[in-house]
Amino acid sequence: MPRLLALLILIANLAGCTGFLDLKHDLKTYQDTITHVSGTLAAPDCPSCAILVVALDKQGQPLSYKVFEHPGRFDILVSPRAAKLFVFQDINHDIAFNPGEPYAPHTLPSAHPDGTPLTGIDLKLSAASSPPPAGTYPDGNLFALRNRLVAGIDVQLGSVAKLNEARFDPERASMGMWQPMQFLKAGLSGIYFLEDYSPNKTPVLFVHGINGTPRDFAELVSRIDRNTYQPWLFYYPSGLEIPTIGDALLNMLNELRQERHFNDLHIVAHSMGGLVSRSLLNTCRLESECDFVRTFTSISSPFGGAQAAKSGVEYAPVVMPVWRSMSPEGPFLTDLFSTPLPAGVEHHILFGFRNVATLSATSGDGTIPLDSQLRHAAQQQAASLRGYDEDHLSILRSELTGTYVNAILSRVPPRQP
């Protein structure tokens, strides 16, 4: 048995002696709870208007919804209880369907196997002189569902928190790896604020890495100019596929944009968080969304993947979904840089080269080799590169890192409302 697999099993044992069993059970629960639905949206009456895709049960009660900035491709997670979709353009921004707004109903298959995606759903929205029949559309405001990922799973959108709270403890990070569904059901995932929202401060979104929490950024956040910027913290179960995490992040940002109307946002990501952020930005580019993103700063990110993830896919008794995304030869990483960054977004790469690993002679930060941090395709699209004599975690505590991140932020003046 390869040495890496023995290490993975040891990690699982340290996580609770039943790590792989927990993962197997949790992934089954995930498949039983969530269905992916995707397709395209056409809206000739208002090509620039936001669209809400609402999942309804058999009685026409709304279960969850997702906001899209404009027509094009859509992808939504729904509960197996979902029997219908109702899609409409929220012309007056009240998060409710009103007569005269373009819409399109759709009935989902009466039986869709657990975990099997529903694809190829192409919908054309159009206005009608009379409202659709009762029970086919959501009646009333949908604001109460704004924090809901799917039925029974709520996320945090703008909840004010402190980094020393128990929800950000390392044990929660471990849950996010080995029991991602339990993490979601516990209501831990979402975008947290460290202070009440201020329209006069530019948001800086911090995205942690695998087995991490927002607390990892405590010292870096303390170095940010809080008179000009407001930290936002994305918290997610790091055991899931990276594209799924990136899509969820886009949904949350679109929801906050609909509510807060912010014009600018900067992204600062550590480790695997850089891959999550790059996945988000690829979707933004392909769907012409996220015009509010100004800069993307990645810190010690494995853009070339991790051989450990590949070995986990090949040898582990249960495969953690994120390992497929992190496998160097896998489709996710192979295509990661085939899509250019969105227009106007600069990528700044910060990397560490202090190797503190006693069992590795590979150059890097003790966790991520340099050839992964400095993948050529990433360098080609980067606006700047900056290296530090720090390891994988100490780079977040470095005063030099904080100084440079502040410099990146200050180079981009905020847009006028």
Where are these regions (language model features)?
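Active-site signature of alpha/beta-hydrolase-fold catalytic machinery across serine-
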Residues: 219, 278-283
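Gly/Ala-rich beta-loop-alpha elbow adjacent to hydrolase catalytic centers
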Residues: 268-269, 273-277, 300
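Helical cap/lid subdomain of alpha/beta-hydrolase-fold lipid enzymes
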Residues: 282-417
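Active-site catalytic motif of lipid deacylating hydrolases and related acyltransferases
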Residues: 197-264
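Structural recognition of the beta-strand scaffold that forms the well-ordered cores
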Residues: 203-206, 230-234, 266-267, 295-299, ...
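Flexible, membrane-associating and regulatory peripheral segments of lipid-active enzymes
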Residues: 17-22, 30-73, 77-80, 86-204, ...
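Positively charged n-region of N-terminal signal peptides that target proteins for export
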Residues: 1-4
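Bacterial N-terminal signal peptides
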Residues: 6-15
